[in-house]
Amino acid sequence: EVVTCDVNDLDFPSSEKFDRVVSVEMFEHMRNYQSLLARIASWMNPRATLFVHIFTHHRYTYTFEVRDESDWMARYFFTGGIMPSDDLLHYFQRDLCLVDHWHVDGRHYQLTSEAWLANMDAHRDSLMPVIAQAYGSEQAMRWWVYWRVFFMSCAELFGYRGGREWIVSHYLFEKP
């Protein structure tokens, strides 16, 4: 079963438990990892596993805060979010135990972002109506530019220092 929603609103009947849970690019939008992992653990059977795929900084954790108009990434894409450090999830093992942790250098996500940008540009005519529907026709061009800049920014960030500064981190947790 694949569930796509705001995890804050997600709830399962207490009788429904899972053996595997996968989270892809969701933890960056959350702040209270202890609470989040406790909720996820409550949905899991004993010995079940959680796989987390998340963007991280190799060393530092920082929040996405909107302080002024220059903070467009925080305002439009990661409102209230956080860029965790690669080791941050190591500190939240009350409900789930970390079994393994590895990372993929950022150049892979650089290439992904560049491919998404190229695909977006190649399909502009078919995407503009979708963007207009999502953001309103008056804002469509603005959001077209925001998305282009987003992909360019991600490509530059994740390619920086040979992909060793911002990375993709993977974690495997198990419920005792």
Predicted regions and their residues:
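Substrate-binding/catalytic lobe of Class I Rossmann-like enzymes that use SAM or dcSAM, i.e.
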Residues: 56, 62-168, 174-176
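Phosphate/diphosphate-binding loops
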Residues: 6-7, 24-25, 36
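A short acidic, Gly/Pro-enriched loop at the edge of an enzyme's catalytic core
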Residues: 8-21
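Alpha/beta-hydrolase-fold catalytic nucleophile elbow
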Residues: 53
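Conserved SAM-binding strand-loop segment of SAM-dependent methyltransferases
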Residues: 1-9
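A short glycine-rich, Lys/Arg-flanked "PGG" loop and its adjoining helix->strand segment in the class I
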Residues: 34-49
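A short SAM/SAH-binding and catalytic strip from SAM-dependent methyltransferases
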Residues: 19-32
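Short conserved AdoMet
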Residues: 31, 45, 93
